[in-house]
């Protein structure tokens, strides 16, 4: 695995690419998983939790995962990277500039993700890294269900 020192902006900028990584491992979306998320968050809307009603009342014909459930599953789908950032004391999750739920994730499907380095820049606090990640329903790889830009600051 190639290592990049967190404050070597020029070397890190070589990671910026329009090309996405290989697909991550797959995560199965089960009704039990959706129900647990609904209980945890209090979002028990029938579109997510009532398979019988969703068969006839939903435009999708089934229950679907919460958009935020899809988002929080990202750490389970991290693909193996060919590089790592080293030499920093702290790494902060600085937030996101973009989050879009662009497709439906039906219960019973599997999802996977892939990403790319979108931006590297120096800031007064450290090195900012913007990662763009797309989550897709397996077998529907032409259109993502989720687009997310995650920002880290390495200090």
Give, region by region, the residue ranges found by the protein language model.
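HotDog/MaoC-like acyl-thioester-processing domains
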Residues: 1-18, 105-155
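Short, surface-exposed secondary-structure edge patches
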Residues: 61, 102-103
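Hot-dog-fold acyl-thioester-processing enzymes
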Residues: 1-93
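Short alpha-helix capping/helix-loop boundary micro-motifs
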Residues: 96-101
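Hydrophobic alpha-helical segments
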Residues: 44, 81, 103, 132-133
